[in-house]
């Protein structure tokens, strides 16, 4: 699979240098991407996910530092314009919905094969993570993005991982 178009921007960390991704001529090697990486992962698998992650960062004008970040509301634009996602991809804020409505939105997205990118913030910082499943008890499965640390099922009203990596609330 290939993406669409290209994008160039100048992150401040490069002091005037630029990063460019040519999504339309890049073949994303999904078959080589693994659910978990370790010291035994092949170079091809590491390169496949590294290229995707670099392009994801470029697509949202990632601000790189020891705690990198980007604005969440640009993610739908990037998914549609560069990665050929359905135009219906949307940015929604939790505060605009009741608990029941929010749960239904998450379950509907997952049922339709669309994991949900979510974010959380505290005075200590912010972090993006992914809802990629749910169970019969109304718990959502969270991939926190910390190499598997603390992944598991949580209530959306109690997203408190026991151990936290970069961007956690502790």
Stretch-by-stretch model annotation:
Residues 1-93:
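Cysteine-nucleophile protease catalytic domains, especially the papain-like/related folds used
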Residues 9, 32, 104, 146-148:
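Intrinsic disorder/low-complexity segments enriched in polar/charged and small flexible residues
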């Amino acid at each position: 699979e290939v993406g669409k178009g290209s994008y160039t921007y100048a992150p401040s960390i490069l002091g005037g240098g630029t990063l460019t991704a040519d999504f339309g001529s890049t073949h994303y090697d999904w078959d080589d991407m693994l659910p978990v990486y370790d010291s035994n992962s092949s170079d091809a698998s590491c390169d496949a996910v590294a290229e995707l992650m670099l392009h994801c960062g470029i697509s949202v004008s990632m601000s790189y530092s020891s705690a990198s970040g980007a604005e969440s509301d640009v993610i739908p634009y990037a998914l549609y314009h560069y990665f050929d996602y359905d135009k219906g991809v949307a940015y929604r804020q939790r505060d605009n919905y009741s608990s029941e409505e929010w749960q239904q939105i998450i379950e509907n997205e997952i049922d339709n094969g669309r994991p949900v990118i979510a974010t959380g913030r505290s005075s200590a910082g912010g972090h993006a993570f992914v809802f990629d499943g749910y169970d019969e008890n109304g718990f959502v499965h969270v991939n926190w993005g910390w190499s598997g640390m603390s992944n598991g099922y949580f209530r959306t009203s109690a997203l408190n991982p026991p151990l936290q990596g970069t961007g956690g609330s502790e």
